[in-house]
Amino acid sequence: MSDAEEVVEEYEEEQEEEDWSEEEEDEQEEAVEEEEAGGAEPEPEGEAETEEANVEEVGPDEEAKDAEEGPVEDTKPKPSRLFMPNLVPPKIPDGERVDFDDIHRKRVEKDLNELQTLIEAHFENRKKEEEELISLKDRIEKRRAERAEQQRIRNEREKERQNRLAEERARREEEENRRKAEDEARKKKALSNMMHFGGYIQKQAQTERKSGKRQTEREKKKKILAERRKALAIDHLNEDQLREKAKELWQSIHNLEAEKFDLQEKFKQQKYEINVLRNRINDNQKVSKTRGKAKVTGRWK
């Protein structure tokens, strides 16, 4: 039951008690009036006695007249005595008296105490909510700082990985270029050995080596590689630009692999042609030697 309903019920009870007390007061007043009326009733009896004395004083002549006239009906009403019981209001014992002011005061104090309790509970809940909100903000800030630190460490690791990949790529390219240079040198040496045009080609190769032509070619290759190999500057790029840069690098790697495959196939074809030419040269040399011996033997015969 709510406080409003309790207050309404108490108010109705107070009204009923007031009505009851008013009814008791009315009954007491009526009882007092009836008692006063009962004390005033003997006066008609005295009047009746005087009337009887007057009747007795009347002479016998009048009685004779009355006897001659015969009985006459008495039309006057006889006075009737009313019996009114004495109504005494019930008395309330002293121990059962109800003090409505005290009840009202206690009710007001109870309401005030409940209101004070509700206010204190409200402020306690509000204080708890504020503390929880502050702790939640602290946790959010702490988590945000941890994420920023993790992101910074991740970026540093990614940067180091990119640097290692770039260094590894540069090292592989340098080794590949060195290997290609050695292969070309071996091919040139093989070609020079296959060509038996006297010592002209060998001398020319020696003079070229002495003149530093190989060093010049190496420098040219280094220059070309330096032009092709560009610095990887990705610190200022965002996520979309990094994706574009990755696609561009992947495309360049794809092109290099395709070019490498073409060069390998070309190298295989050249190697095959060199072997064919070497076999032909060997066959021709064998044929020329046998012919020379046959001519010499025939001439001596």
From Swiss-Prot:
Positions of post-translational N-acetylserine modification: 2
Modified-residue entries (Phosphothreonine), positions: 207, 216, 297
Classification via InterPro entries: TNNT (IPR027707), Troponin (IPR001978), Troponin_sf (IPR038077)
One Pfam family here: Troponin
Region annotation (Disordered) ranges: 1-97, 125-224
Posttranslational modification: Phosphorylation at Thr-216 by PRKCA induces significant reduction in myofilament calcium sensitivity and actomyosin ATPase activity.
An example Gene Ontology molecular-function term: troponin C binding
GO CC list: cardiac Troponin complex; myofibril; sarcomere; sarcoplasm; striated muscle thin filament; troponin complex
Amino acid composition bias (Basic and acidic residues), ranges on this chain: 125-186, 206-224
Biased composition (Acidic residues): 1-72
Modified-residue entries (Phosphoserine), positions: 2, 211
Key words, A-Z: Acetylation, Muscle protein, Phosphoprotein
GO BP term, example: ventricular cardiac muscle tissue morphogenesis
UniProt superkingdom: Eukaryota
Family (UniProt): Belongs to the troponin T family.
Function description: Troponin T is the tropomyosin-binding subunit of troponin, the thin filament regulatory complex which confers calcium-sensitivity to striated muscle actomyosin ATPase activity.
Record protein name field: Troponin T, cardiac muscle
